[in-house]
């Protein structure tokens, strides 16, 4: 009979098989009430699953990450229960858990509206309020198929036919009259599923294949309690206000149009931000001793066959033909950088060789995945590749990490999650080579005092990598930076250097990206700052305004003085009330507004206001210029007097 060992090392002895819920009851009524599931010998199981032999057991509650995920998955089933009651002819496809919630793909003969979602959510609450038990039954494959065939659930039948072995015993979860199929676990009772919200719908092809039928995907979020739900909804509301697509339109930064899906039309102010960002990274390239190069926009398909991209990546590549030759528009810069390395004989004394490029790349992303600047088809990578010896890897990775944190810190990103992905099952190279490479990456992180998580088996087949994920002010994660070792591509493209013993040696290549995509990073910055860019990167840094026509000459003189100092400035001499001008430029998020009236003209001063509404008073013109230049040149995140 089972001896159950709990996480604190204590043991409970039973003379019959017990479930996690039974053990929770044995410990106390509070834990029994909170029990959602169990982890038996490391494996998640339903609260009612029987344990027949000695086992390690952890009781899972809503406070655990696994408990929250289980509850969210059960909310997807609750959605299925509700939609089948409201529209019985609906056919259910798949309903997984996603970050912060769940979705369900459904085949329904109506286009779901917001009113439908409200009705559906209301029915879900009515069902959850009944606090009914969820009954799990393990059945044969044939019984599961017969159950769903009788209910007209064609997609469930297809899943059984195509994805589940006939020897398996699928789990059927009964929500009163509604039945769903899942590996589980799920909540034992619907009392755990009360704090949810249906959010939106979108189209989704069955199996993700555009040849299949388009289904409707219903998204929802679910949380452990009302407070967490409301906090999340408030974050979403704030995120909507910060949406870079909305701000981009308000500030006239860029636009996109159907004739060029996923390609950015940069307007003057947006392109100013782009160029400032590029200039900053270019300065860092010089500081960290990189060459800056520029590779061709497209290259012959033969080269991409050599690299393996044609075999593994061709669906994501744009191609064109000329004079009976097929060309690929580059999706990445690395093959071009190897070609530059290959020009001329290289010695070990020439290494490390650091090569950076603002490379214009294109990838044929699915049209449904395109999202403003965050997911595009045409983008600019701040890409770099370092060619070095095996002995130089650790020092070079160390410098890459320093550069990554140097750049991110300038923009105020200090919450950075770091993951080290190690050798996958299918890989090239020897175990010794991989061990040394992984140790070099880990040591470089440790030497820089950076905590990190291992991602076992998640490295590329050609080398381990470090990933840097930024967390913004809304705690959203953005994976931007990468340091990737590559033992494969240089050799495949014939790269070598003359070693100390006059032998030919293939260099190690380090792929290094910091911003990732310039376009995406501008999108991230726009949402992080809500369009209130630090002065150094703001498209217009200062607007000088007159109150009446009598100050026009003074405004123009002051504007020229600021321009000559290298400050991006505009004069606003329109015949409008000063309050109107201030409101307009405040909405445009211009960092500083300089107001000139007769008093300022007489004193040779200027009244200074910030976009946050702070009145800095009347200041000497030279003092204003000096302070602005100091703020801009230091790339300060804060304005004067903040």
From Swiss-Prot:
Annotated Zn(2+) binding sites: 334, 385, 511
Enzyme class per UniProt: ligase
UniProt catalytic activity: tRNA(Thr) + L-threonine + ATP = L-threonyl-tRNA(Thr) + AMP + diphosphate + H(+)
Enzyme nomenclature, EC number: 6.1.1.3
Residue ranges the record marks as coiled coil: none
GO cellular component annotations of the record: cytosol
Cofactor: Zn(2+)
Keywords: Aminoacyl-tRNA synthetase, ATP-binding, Cytoplasm, Ligase, Metal-binding, Nucleotide-binding, Protein biosynthesis, RNA-binding, tRNA-binding, Zinc
GO BP: threonyl-tRNA aminoacylation
Top-level taxon of origin: Bacteria
Pfam families membership: HGTP_anticodon, TGS, tRNA-synt_2b, tRNA_SAD
Name of the protein this chain belongs to: Threonine--tRNA ligase
Gene: thrS
């Amino acid at each position: 009979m089972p001896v159950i060992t709990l996480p604190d090392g204590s043991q409970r002895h039973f003379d019959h098989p017990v479930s996690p819920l039974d053990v929770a009851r044995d410990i106390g009524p509070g834990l029994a009430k909170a029990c959602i599931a169990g982890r038996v010998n490391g494996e998640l199981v339903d609260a009612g699953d029987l344990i027949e032999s000695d086992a390690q057991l952890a009781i899972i509650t809503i406070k655990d990450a696994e408990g929250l995920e289980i509850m969210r998955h059960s909310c997807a089933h609750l959605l299925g229960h509700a939609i089948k009651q409201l529209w019985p002819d609906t056919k259910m496809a798949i309903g997984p858990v996603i970050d912060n919630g769940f979705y369900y793909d459904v085949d329904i003969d109506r286009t779901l509206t917001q009113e439908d979602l409200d009705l559906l959510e209301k029915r879900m609450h009515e069902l959850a309020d009944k606090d009914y038990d969820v009954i799990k039954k393990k059945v044969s494959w044939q019984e599961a198929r017969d159950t769903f065939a009788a209910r007209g659930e064609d997609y469930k039948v297809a899943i059984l036919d195509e994805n589940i072995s006939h020897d398996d015993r699928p789990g059927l979860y009964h929500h009163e009259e509604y039945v769903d199929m899942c590996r589980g676990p799920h909540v034992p009772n619907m009392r755990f599923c009360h704090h949810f919200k249906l959010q939106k719908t979108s189209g989704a092809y069955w199996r993700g294949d555009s040849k299949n039928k388009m289904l409707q995907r219903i998204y929802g979020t679910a949380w452990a309690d009302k407070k967490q739900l409301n906090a999340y909804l408030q974050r979403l509301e704030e995120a909507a206000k910060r949406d870079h697509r909305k701000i981009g339109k308000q500030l006239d930064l860029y636009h996109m149009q159907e004739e060029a899906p996923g390609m950015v039309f940069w307007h003057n102010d947006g392109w100013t931000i782009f160029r400032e960002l590029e200039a900053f990274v270019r300065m860092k390239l010089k500081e960290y001793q990189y060459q800056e190069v520029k590779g061709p926009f497209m290259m012959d398909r033969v080269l991409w066959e050599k690299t393996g991209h044609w075999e593994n990546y061709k669906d994501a590549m744009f191609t064109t033909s000329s004079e009976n030759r097929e060309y690929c528009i580059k999706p990445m810069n690395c093959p071009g950088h190897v070609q530059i390395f290959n020009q001329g004989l290289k010695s070990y004394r020439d290494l490390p060789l650091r090569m950076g490029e603002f490379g214009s790349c294109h990838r044929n992303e699915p049209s449904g995945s395109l999202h403003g600047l965050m997911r595009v088809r045409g983008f600019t990578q701040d890409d770099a590749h370092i060619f070095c010896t095996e002995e130089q890897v650790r020092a070079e990775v160390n410098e890459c990490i320093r550069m990554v944190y140097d750049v991110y810190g300038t923009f105020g990103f200090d919450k950075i999650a770091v993951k080290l992905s190690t050798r996958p099952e299918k890989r090239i190279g020897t175990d010794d080579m991989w061990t040394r490479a992984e140790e070099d990456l880990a040591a470089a992180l440790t030497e820089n005092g950076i905590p990190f998580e291992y991602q076992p088996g998640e490295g590329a087949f050609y080398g381990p990598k470090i990933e840097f994920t930024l967390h913004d002010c809304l705690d959203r994660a953005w994976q931007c930076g990468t340091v990737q070792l590559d033992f494969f591509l240089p050799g495949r493209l014939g790269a070598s250097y003359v070693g100390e013993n006059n032998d030919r040696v293939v260099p190690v290549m380090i792929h290094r990206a910091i911003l990732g995509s310039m376009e995406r990073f501008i999108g991230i910055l726009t949402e992080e700052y809500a369009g209130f860019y630090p002065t150094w990167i703001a498209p217009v840094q200062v607007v000088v305004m007159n109150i009446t026509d009598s100050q026009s000459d003074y405004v123009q003189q002051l504007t020229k003085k600021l321009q000559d100092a290298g400050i991006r400035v505009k004069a606003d001499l329109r015949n409008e009330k000063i309050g109107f001008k201030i409101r307009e430029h405040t909405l445009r998020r211009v960092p500083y507004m300089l107001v000139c009236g007769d008093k300022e003209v007489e004193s040779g001063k200027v009244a200074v206001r910030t976009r946050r509404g702070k009145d800095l008073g009347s200041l000497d013109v030279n003092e204003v210029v000096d302070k602005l230049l100091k703020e801009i040149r230091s790339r300060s995140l804060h304005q004067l007097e903040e």
